[in-house]
Amino acid sequence: MSPDSRDPEAQRDVGLTKNTSSVNIPLESVKTDKTSNASPIMGPGEGPKIDDTLVSWSGPDDSQNPQNMPQWKKWVITWLLSFLNVWVTFSSTIFASAVRTTSLEYGVSRVVMTLGVSLTVLGFAVGPLIWGPMSEVIGRLTPFYFGYAVFCIFQIPVGVAQNVYTILICRFFIGFFGTSAMAVTPGVLADIFSPKDRGVAVSVYAAAAFIGPIFGPIVGGFVVDSSLGWRWTAWITLILASAFGLAALVFVPETYGPIILQRRAARLRQETRNFAYHSALDENPPTLNDIIFKYFLRPFQMLIKEPILLLVTLYISLVYGVLYLFFVAYPIEFLEVRRWTHAGVAALPLLAVMLGTLAGCLTILFVTGHTYPRKMAKMGRVPPEERLKLMMVGSVSLPIGLFWFGWTSSRSVHWFAQTAAGFPIGIGLALIWVQGLSFLIDVYLMFANSALAGNTLIRSAVGAAFPLFGAPMYHKLGVNWASSLLGFLSVAMIPIPVAFYYYGPKIRAMSKFSPKL
């Protein structure tokens, strides 16, 4: 048996498509097909035995199939989970506004206190390696609610911390446990939406990934400079995250098909005393070796052997690093260079970046909604390279914004001229990020979880590192040349989507991980 033949994705496909048994039938008609596991040697004219005890969906309209949820409920779930992800990413950057204050309070350098941001992002790198596998073994809800609850709890020691070590250690665990929501949400969206309808939901989720970290320093700046003080950056996060977490506890059910069918089979065994009832997941439960290979070994194997995954991951990692570095760069520009006096006001220019990311996500929705149905009707499928058109647009928009931001850094230049540079930066971030990840999913399909696990690990490590060297770089080079350096790096990445747009099909044809469709 190949290592991939027992993947949870494969089990899910089996569980969602096989319809060999209906559970909505009179109990007296339930029977155990004791011949279903007979010898595979069959006589002439014989076909395979049907296993009447294999529990699957009762039909395409099975009410317990998450794909058949009412549309309103699907969107309640989508918006709730997106808001939970907003507060997780919000928590990663709200502390950035407290770096200056806490460094003075505890008598350490700002670089040390910047670890409060970097360690949270580092937790984002490690967490999915745990929460991803758990969500496919025991279902979506258990790891999600457990991780999110602990994420909320770890806000408390930060709020009452009496030393730097408590803050830094707890900030790491805030990222580690908070990423349970980030790791589980894409799976939930895949569970409840068909591929045709999933694009809008994924764009909403992707927008949350940008709104949270941008919103964090703005709120944090006003909180830190108010009578509340920096400790309320933790209390506000706790209040907001807990409120939405309780709402999710009420409205978000289990959505992982194989787990739902496994529980249905267990209920039938108890009600009928027929212990032959089982689900596809009972037949092929994921083993420890499967999980280790899929989430720990295969991602690195793919990063080494797959040029598409490696180069797109490097590009997305740069984008992620730039996003988190800006939470250091903006205070330097507006508090130190322009000599604004209020941290919250100095963070308001980040709203231009947020508006740009929203514009980028809306562009993706508009283009996808208009071009994909036509191509699907004409070709029967849409090649993954179609995603790269907007990614190429973003690859031009990002460096334009970075150079614009850098060379309008002067007190003699009106602040609005520099603030406006955030809009093309935001568009570039969104188009590269969302379309890059969508491209990887389309390329690797059933191996997408492994591909995204490797991508998440690398990009989060880069995102954790950038704020640490960002402040020294901006102080030494100045805002002009530090931003230009990022702009030159972005220009160097432009050939990646261009090359894969033209040569992607040939490269995919040589890949052992990209299905030949």
Curated annotation (Swiss-Prot):
GO CC annotation terms, alphabetical: plasma membrane
Q: Which UniProt keywords apply?
A: Glycoprotein, Membrane, Transmembrane, Transmembrane helix, Transport, Virulence
InterPro entries noted in UniProt = MFS, MFS_dom, MFS_trans_sf
On whether Cytoplasm is a keyword of this UniProt record, the answer is: no
- Ranges of Basic and acidic residues compositional bias? 1-12
Q: Name one GO molecular function term.
A: transmembrane transporter activity
- One Pfam entry for this protein is MFS_1
Where, if anywhere, are coiled coils annotated?
Answer: none
Q: How does it sit in the membrane?
A: Multi-pass membrane protein
Instruction: Indicate which residues are glycosylated according to the record.
Output: N19
Localization per record: Membrane
Determine the domain of life of the protein's source.
Eukaryota
- Mainly resides where? membrane
**Which intervals of the chain are annotated as region Disordered?**
1-45
Instruction: Spell out where the chain crosses the membrane.
Output: 75-95, 111-131, 141-161, 172-192, 204-224, 232-252, 308-328, 347-367, 390-410, 421-441, 457-475, 485-505
The record describes the protein's role as: MFS transporter; part of the gene cluster that mediates the biosynthesis the mycotoxin ascochitine, an o-quinone methide that plays a possible protective role against other microbial competitors in nature and is considered to be important for pathogenicity of legume-associated Didymella species.
What does the similarity note say? Answer: Belongs to the major facilitator superfamily. CAR1 family.
| PANTHER family linked to this entry | MAJOR FACILITATOR SUPERFAMILY, MAJOR FACILITATOR SUPERFAMILY (MFS) PROFILE DOMAIN-CONTAINING PROTEIN-RELATED
Report what the protein is called: Ascochitine biosynthesis cluster MFS transporter
